[in-house]
Amino acid sequence: MRVVVVTLALLFLTGTQARYFWQHDEPQAPLDRLRDLVDVYLETVKASGKDAIAQFEASAVGKQLDLKLADNLDTLGAAAAKLREDMAPYYKEVREMWLKDTESLRAELTKDLEEVKEKIRPFLDQFSAKWTEELEQYRQRLAPVAEELKELTKQKVELMQQKLTPVAEEARDRLRGHVEELRKNLAPYSDELRQKLSQKLEEIREKGIPQAAEYQAKVVEQLSNLREKMTPLVQDFKERLTPYAENLKTRFISLLDELQKTVA
């Protein structure tokens, strides 16, 4: 019920303006404090930085609530960093297990890829040489046009376009031809690689059913062990957070109770 009251109070009070809030050094009415608190909270979210938190804690409301937001923020950050650090070894353990169990398959696939790579290397080198040669010829043919561009006027734009269009189209068609030639040369090796991969997967499926079951059991066991190791770490992190959450909740409820008594 108190959560609902707090929510309604925040919804109704967010439209008010806390004028001269930072100059308030005298005790305020609970309603004013809650209104100012909401305004400062919105400004803090907007600023999203420690400067806003420090400014809030230096205000009248901040001093009275004494939330120690900056200290709590640093503490929570340290707790999160510790949790991440504690989790790292277990993540590494699972990763190493996975790499070890798939080492044989990865080695075979790498070997097949290297074989195909060596077969297609001449075609790639040939394509690269032709592509470079075509671009150089294109550059040389454009050199005179580039000189004319220095003195280009509106009257010469159409003439310049007429000169450039056939050159660009010819270069485009020739480059497309080289790409198509490369595609045709690589197609058989692409099919070969696809067939080898399919064959490896089929062999694993046919021969590796017992191994797959064993591996599945091993993964389940590792995940179970990981969960057991992670549980106390997460619980420790939760326990670190609880005091700050309870402290914040208690102070807000106290302020709201005082407000309800005042307006009653």
UniProtKB/Swiss-Prot annotation:
The principal location of this protein is secreted
Native source organism of the sequence: Anas platyrhynchos (Mallard)
Q: One GO BP annotation here? A: lipoprotein metabolic process
Question: What name does UniProt use for this protein?
Answer: Apolipoprotein A-I
One GO term of the cellular component aspect? low-density lipoprotein particle
Record's keyword terms, sorted: Cholesterol metabolism, HDL, Lipid metabolism, Lipid transport, Repeat, Secreted, Signal, Steroid metabolism, Sterol metabolism, Transport
Record localization: Secreted
Segment forming the signal sequence: 1-18
Q: Recall the GO molecular function terms of this protein's record.
A: cholesterol transfer activity; phosphatidylcholine-sterol O-acyltransferase activator activity; phospholipid binding
* The keyword Cell inner membrane is assigned to this record: no
Give yes or no: UniProt keyword Secreted. yes
* Tissue expression summary: Major protein of plasma HDL, also found in chylomicrons.
Pfam families in the cross-refs = Apolipoprotein
sequence repeat ranges, renumbered to this chain: 67-88, 89-110, 111-121, 122-143, 144-165, 166-187, 188-209, 210-231, 232-242, 243-264
Q: Where is this region: 10 X approximate tandem repeats?
A: 67-264
What this chain does, per the entry, is described as:
Participates in the reverse transport of cholesterol from tissues to the liver for excretion by promoting cholesterol efflux from tissues and by acting as a cofactor for the lecithin cholesterol acyltransferase (LCAT).
So what family is this one in? Answer: Belongs to the apolipoprotein A1/A4/E family.
